[in-house]
């Protein structure tokens, strides 16, 4: 049995009980969904099993909880997009930057990116929410991660991992669709209830709730000047072959850092 202290009260739980089960017992005490827990002050995901500790709950009203929500929603969106478009038709799908209280996603490939297409992606996302698909986590070697992302056509990530110093990385998946995320996730897709996809320029904006009101989507506020500036920065990176950290590492490793600095100046 594990002794778990919650709100000053200690209760016994059988070994093998998950934090998800404990969270369900206390969900009625919270206005917003419990997404993570703090075990002796350290964050853990809900699939972890109980142990002797002092426990507190993290909801979408807390920064770590909202971050987990947004990561999980991003992964679910990517899976839905690839499913609707067909994996072989997606040339590029990347969350570039935040804009207008949302996240701008650049999308290129053999598809027509319009409202009808995005409505199909949203419908697929809602299907995943209804199914409450577990978001699985596995640890793999860095070499295996490189091989995986090359196989999936995610060459930017494979390029990045070639310079990673640690020997293992965490891979998250939804129903077989895998990607790398640095940070915690919610337990299943059923928690990702609020989202929207809005066409914008050469991509779309993924809208998600804010900590101020986790049950409501903020209005999208186009910011044309900021978008133009961020787009110009992205285009400059492409011209310099510096679209991501992996590309920057390549230039540093090849001894071109001084030339790069002069070019930027």
Give the ranges of each region predicted by the language model.
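Active/ligand-binding-proximal structured segments within catalytic/core domains
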Residues: 23-26, 66-84, 95
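Short, contiguous acidic and Ser/Thr-rich linear segments
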Residues: 8-18
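Short strand-turn-strand beta-turns centered on an Asx-Gly dipeptide
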Residues: 6-9, 38-41, 108
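Short acidic beta-strand-loop surface patches of small beta-rich interaction domains
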Residues: 34-48
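Short amphipathic, charge-patterned alpha-helical segments
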Residues: 17-29
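Auxiliary tRNA-acceptor-end handling modules of aminoacyl-tRNA synthetases
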Residues: 52-68, 80, 89-100, 104-265
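Short aromatic-centered micro-motifs
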Residues: 4, 37, 179
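Short secondary-structure junctions
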Residues: 28-32, 84-90
């Amino acid at each position: 049995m594990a002794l778990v202290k919650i709100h000053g009260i200690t209760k016994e739980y059988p070994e093998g009980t998950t934090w998800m089960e404990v969270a369900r017992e206390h969900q009625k005490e919270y206005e917003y969904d419990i997404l993570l827990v703090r075990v002796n002050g350290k964050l853990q995901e809900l699939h972890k099993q109980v142990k002797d500790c002092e426990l507190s709950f993290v909801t979408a009203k807390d920064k770590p909880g909202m971050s987990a929500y947004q990561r999980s929603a991003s992964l679910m969106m990517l899976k839905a997009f690839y499913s609707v478009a067909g994996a072989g038709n997606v040339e590029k799908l990347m969350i570039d930057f935040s804009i207008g209280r949302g996240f701008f996603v650049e999308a290129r490939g053999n598809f027509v990116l319009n409202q009808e297409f995005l409505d199909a992606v949203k419908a697929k996302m809602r299907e995943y929410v209804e199914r409450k698909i577990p978001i699985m986590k596995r640890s793999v070697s860095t070499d295996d991660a490189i091989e995986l992302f090359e196989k999936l056509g995610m060459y930017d990530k494979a390029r990045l991992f070639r310079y990673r110093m640690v020997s293992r990385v965490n891979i998250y998946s939804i129903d077989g669709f895998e990607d790398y995320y640095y940070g915690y996730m919610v337990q299943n897709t059923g928690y990702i209830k609020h989202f929207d996809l809005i066409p914008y320029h050469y991509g779309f904006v993924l809208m998600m709730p804010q900590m101020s009101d986790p049950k409501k989507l903020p209005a999208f506020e186009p910011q044309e000047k900021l978008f133009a500036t961020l787009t110009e920065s992205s285009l400059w990176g492409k011209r310099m072959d510096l679209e991501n950290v992996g590309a920057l590492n390549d230039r540093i490793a090849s001894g071109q850092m001084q030339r790069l600095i002069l070019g930027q100046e």
